């Protein structure tokens, strides 16, 4: 892991990470300190009982399920805020989905910025590099950026947009120079596809 000295100590914060692979949340829990404890935002509450991958996340005890509908926004916000208010870390895949590339990031959703501003906690950008394709001998790097302060910004439309842009820029910088791995052989492809579904491959992410 690169940039461990940038991780805030003994204080809650929101971790916004790139998301090339379903296994990424487990890497976060493995690489980051036990205190403060880390929780992962997602998956959707309705999916918690379907699919073995979602069940594994549920059994792990690290998930904060959410409801995507606007009518449930208040409940979703309360769940996320409760994690931060208890002094824990909330990790969010800012892209809102799996990415198909490691050296690029799709435009971020505004959820990470909104929650960080509501909780008044800093945002730590994190690039996960090396998990797009799974195969033996693969090197995985977690690259943390400087915390992004939320002071001076309001949790309104303008504040959320500005903070989202700052996070996007920081994550793009962390991915500068990252080259895409060539696809592995049949076994590596099979293992990768076993853990991941990408129905949007005809809509590639934009460069960070």
Residue ranges and their predicted role:
Residues 3:
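Short phosphate-coordinating micro-motif centered on Lys-Gly-acidic
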Residues 8-70:
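Catalytic core of membrane glycerolipid acyltransferases/transacylases, capturing the structured
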Residues 74-208:
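Non-catalytic C-terminal accessory region of glycerolipid acyltransferases
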């Amino acid at each position: 892991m690169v940039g461990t000295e940038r991780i805030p100590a003994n204080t809650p914060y929101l971790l916004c990470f790139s998301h090339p692979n379903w296994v990424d949340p487990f890497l976060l829990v493995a690489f980051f300190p036990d205190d403060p404890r880390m929780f992962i935002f997602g998956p959707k509450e309705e999916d918690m009982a379907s699919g073995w991958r979602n069940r594994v996340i549920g059994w792990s005890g690290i998930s904060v399920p959410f409801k995507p509908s606007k009518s449930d926004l208040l409940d979703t916000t309360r769940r996320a805020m409760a994690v931060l208010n208890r002094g824990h870390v909330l990790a969010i895949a800012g892209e809102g989905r799996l990415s198909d590339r490691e050296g690029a990031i799709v435009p971020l959703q505004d959820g990470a910025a909104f929650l960080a501003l509501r909780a008044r906690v800093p945002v730590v950008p994190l690039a996960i590099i090396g998990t797009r394709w799974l195969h033996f001998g693969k090197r995985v790097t977690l690259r943390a950026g400087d915390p992004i302060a939320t002071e001076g910004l309001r949790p309104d439309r303008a504040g959320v947009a500005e903070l989202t842009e700052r996070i996007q820029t920081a994550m793009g910088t962390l991915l500068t120079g990252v080259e895409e791995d060539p696809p592995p052989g049949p076994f590596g492809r099979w293992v990768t596809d076993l853990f991941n579904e990408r129905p949007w491959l005809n809509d590639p992410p934009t460069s960070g």
